Amino acid sequence: MRSSTHIFVSFVVYCGVFVTSAIALSNHTNAYQCDRWSNVLNELQANLFHEGQCRSAALRASGTFGGGGADGSIIQFAHTELAYPANEGLEEMVYTLKHFADGHEVSYGDMIQFAGAVALSNCPGSPRLRFYAGRPEAIAPSPPNLLPLPTDPVEKILSRMADAGFNAGDTVALLAAHSIAVQNTIDPSIPDSPLDSTPRIFDTQFYLETLLRGTRYPGKGRGPAQSKSPIEHEFRLASDAAIARHTSTACEWQSFIDNQEGLRSAFRNAMVKLANQGHDNLVDCSFVIPVPPPWNLPVEYPSGKSRSDVEQSCSDVPFPTISLNSDVHD
């Protein structure tokens, strides 16, 4: 399957950003409505996620802020939304999810959110996301040009996210999806390039490494969507580098370094807000989502890197003490 900047979880993150209205979630569980998702789970794990692998080609999606709506409009109106530049590379994932949704007679919006929660559950260290079912099908495509790109300045990114009800802290937390991400389309010369050194683990290594001084481009590309990376074979998005160093977000970014529980909680809360915007009276089927494998190892400097390589942009609090290690886990 063709892959791009984000794994599937990022696809879900950005599919939900610009659908806003009041949220009224049900606290009850409907056995009939939830039980069908056990069958969906089994098929996704076997046929999409390769028996529960975290890093799989089937998990990857596109661009930094691509996507349609949490109502599944990107699937319902694929012919329209897949033409948007921000959705480059999503074609195969969109049509794959359409196949599964049609086969199980569930809505496209529900399928996007469920598959994202299941995908994340396969990654050690990730939070267990809640899943609410009952989204109706979309009745119109998402408008174009709603979501920012990796080439956009931080102010524009934060402004767009604020329009959707997400503050700067939410934005930084949602970027945790990049801890289990790879790119293919920004620089096709280096397919499957990870955005940190632990792409199979949902951890805070991404937040540390994005603050390390960039020294090289990993491939042949020198486009405006990427910045120099600190490690061979590691890719860095220009927007990630900018958000990590911006005065509005630098301290929030730094706060997640070696703070696994803090990141898990912040990401989970932001995803609940994102996944359920624009819908009411959804049914709680969270019990169907598997419990992710644990991961509690501390963050480490990659081989050859140390505190002197950090470009600290938050002056309010000291930088956390990080151990040196020549073998970062993958």
From Swiss-Prot:
Disulphides: 34-285, 54-123, 251-314
Q: Where does Ca(2+) 1 bind?
A: 69, 71, 73
Q: Where is the signal peptide?
A: 1-24
Key word Heme present: yes
SUPFAM superfamilies (alphabetical):
Heme-dependent peroxidases
Which subcellular locations apply to this protein?
A: Secreted
Q: Which residues are glycosylated?
A: 27
Which note does the record give on the cofactor?
Binds 2 calcium ions per subunit. Binds 1 heme b (iron(II)-protoporphyrin IX) group per subunit.
* Pfam hit, one: peroxidase
Record-level GO cellular component terms: extracellular region
PROSITE patterns listed in its UniProt record: PEROXIDASE_1, PEROXIDASE_4
Function, as annotated: Can oxidize the lignin redox mediator veratryl alcohol to veratryl aldehyde. May be involved in oxidation of lignocellulose substrates.
Q: Any extra remark in the record? A: In comparison to other ligninolytic peroxidases, lacks a Mn(2+)-oxidation site (as in manganese peroxidases (MnP) and versatile peroxidase (VP)) and an exposed tryptophan responsible for high redox-potential substrate oxidation (as in lignin peroxidase (LiP) and VP).
- Return the similarity comment: Belongs to the peroxidase family. Ligninase subfamily.
This protein is called Low-redox potential peroxidase
Supply the source organism for this entry: Taiwanofungus camphoratus (Poroid brown-rot fungus)
